[in-house]
Amino acid sequence: MMKRLLIGMIRIYQRYISPLKRPSCRFYPTCSEYSIQAIQKYGVVKGCWKSLVRILKCHPFHPGGYDPV
């Protein structure tokens, strides 16, 4: 239940909020897609933790690149 709610919220962000901003994610897959994959693979708690760590790495001083779940 919680997993579906979080993934739904991320999908809403991807569809309605993300297009309003310029592309800035330094990683592939994007941080929001990574978050969905992490929550699906690891569950809510560990998936959210991995998502938070990933989002904190997404800044101009990090090289980025391919970073799968």
Swiss-Prot record:
<keyword id="KW-1003">Cell membrane</keyword>
<keyword id="KW-0472">Membrane</keyword>
<comment type="function">
    <text>Could be involved in insertion of integral membrane proteins into the membrane.</text>
</comment>
<dbReference type="Pfam" id="PF01809">
    <property type="entry name" value="YidD"/>
</dbReference>
<comment type="similarity">
    <text>Belongs to the UPF0161 family.</text>
</comment>
<protein>
    <recommendedName>
        <fullName>Putative membrane protein insertion efficiency factor</fullName>
    </recommendedName>
</protein>
<dbReference type="InterPro" id="IPR002696">
    <property type="entry name" value="Membr_insert_effic_factor_YidD"/>
</dbReference>
<dbReference type="GO" id="GO:0005886">
    <property type="term" value="C:plasma membrane"/>
</dbReference>
